Amino acid sequence: MGQGSSHDAPHLTPEQLSHTLAQRFASKSYTPLELYCFSTVFRSLADTSSGVRYWSEPTLCRFLELPDALGVGSVLFQMCSYLGAFPLPSQAPAILTQEALLKVVTILTERYGSVIKRRGRELWLRELYRGLAVYDRGVSASIEEEHEREAQPVATEGESSGMGFAIDAPEDGEGDEDEDDELVLAALDSMDAVEVFKQGEQANVHHSIIPTDNFLKLVELLLLIAPIDAQQSLSSLAPELSDERVEELRRVAHVIVSAFGVENHPGVTYRTFNTVISAALPYLFNGLNPLFEHFLFAKDFDLSKRKNDPSSPSQDTHPVIPPPKTVMDPEPLLPQPGEILNLTLLSQLSFFLKGNTLFRRLRPLYSGNNHGFSMGSFEKQVFNWRAPTILLVKGRVLPATPSNTRERALQDMLPPKRLPNSVPESQENQTLIYGAYIPTQWKHTGKTCFGDESTVLFQLSPTHDVFKASKFSTDYVYFNKSPTQPPGIGLGTPIPTQSSAHTHSSHSQTLFRPGPVSLHLDDALEFGIFTHVSDGGGSFHPSALPVRKRRDWQDRFEIESLEVWGCGGDEVAEAQRKEWAWQEREAEARRRINLGTGDQELDRELLKMAGIISGDRSGGSMG
């Protein structure tokens, strides 16, 4: 920037800066038709006070069709009021005038890139955090003091002191406030107004916190709107929320929020927010984008019905953008709920797996309680699916002392248990849900595992966590039938080489040693073992959650439900159906030959056609 622009900046008032940015968003981020629709929507619902048109909290909630049962209206309105003041945090909360609301829509739909060149996702998340946070030096200071107390034991007592917010303890770059305001700086820079930033337009995220209750309500809404399209109303997505559905949303929201370590803290600090979102919930806020795209479609407006009220603004003559016609009977988000997977857990999965591979794209392949808990049934139902799959397993922690011979046999095949469970003793009756995203077709393992670097291991309950594949080892997924070691289904445990397997087989009992971060289901599909060693070094990275920093655990659990879902459209399902039909025809042919049809002449002809006997009833040639 030149000298002249620096002199011009101080003459711009905050109102002028806000107006200038809104005008640039309008001219560069939207088409004329989209702007017309936005203006129509705003004017049709705006209240007026002292000549100023604005939207109130009830108006925003009514337009977005936010369910009253979630109580999230005030949280979302607070966020919008903050974003409406962008890029001047000192002016927040802003009155939601037409210009302020346009800035809100621009930021939440991520359309600001044509004006603000720095488009990093982290910068966008930082603005969302600020919109949700409250600034209380007393609360944040008490948390920082606790961080400092926890930082020292974390370094020396890895197992028990990993709980807490050690990652929020002061680190290099803690005081780099300019870095915290890059998006604000970029917006001001686009208007040659960086001088305003130097005069006090800063909002240090390290002196703030998102209240737990507010965050919980927002996560409930995000679970509900995760599958929404820009042309789909929230009322059509969830026409009525039953008490059971609200309770389910709340339960899963608690699981997700627990990943932020809020049990012993009043809220979520920025460092924890940024770390957890980046590591385990990268798509958490994606649903806000299509929700706020609703402002760009004028619904139920007919230009033939013009207002003649002289006090109303003159009506433009631009045509309205009609929302695309909705399909009367759209394909369901999930063909049918499983014993583990339902709509709410599907939304939870979409927070770290792309939604376009999940919603309306899943097919139930295998259910242990329906098809039988056996490796053969699993193979028959899953192996013909030539696309990615999602494996889900649910169970409860086994008691420390075996209560029957089956549990004793499991204990005998494992080394003595040194690691604690992931849940405290008082909560050991809680349901565990682990799972995996397998990007490749299933197969028998043989000498090497299958899967690739996009394989994901995860936990959905009682805490949300994601363990991404590493490049250190490629022992991603295996499917082994005895005597191949280790027998069963699993991820993250190395397959013994042929020589070592032979050496091990000479022992009367072969101990199974799980990988550092691994999931193993025994070959009876009766028990599961999830192991987490924070030092890592295996096929999957250890947990990146601050609350689990340097924490080791091993869950040995009895399997209650096991499911596999196929990711893919109708074409993949049709290919699988044809494969199953072919296999069924082959099996039927073999049964008719082996068991007989009851007609001796027909049996003889079938055997002759198969080359098993010759015309004189002697055995067929094998040459």
From Swiss-Prot:
Family: Belongs to the RTC5 family.
Gene this chain is encoded by: RTC5
Stretch list, region Disordered: 144-179, 307-328
Disulfide feature: none
Chief location category: cytoplasm
One record GO biological process: response to oxidative stress
Pfam families (alphabetical): TLD (PF07534)
Matching PANTHER family: NUCLEOLAR PROTEIN 7/ESTROGEN RECEPTOR COACTIVATOR-RELATED (PTHR23354), RESTRICTION OF TELOMERE CAPPING PROTEIN 5 (PTHR23354:SF130)
Protein name: Restriction of telomere capping protein 5
GO CC terms: cytoplasm; nucleus
Compartment list: Cytoplasm
Biological role: May be involved in a process influencing telomere capping.
Record's keyword annotation contains Cytoplasm: yes
Biased composition regions of type Acidic residues, renumbered to the chain: 169-179
SMART domains reported for this sequence: TLDc
Keyword annotations from UniProtKB, A to Z: Cytoplasm
Keyword set includes Transferase: no
Superkingdom of the source species: Eukaryota
Span of domain TLDc: 339-568
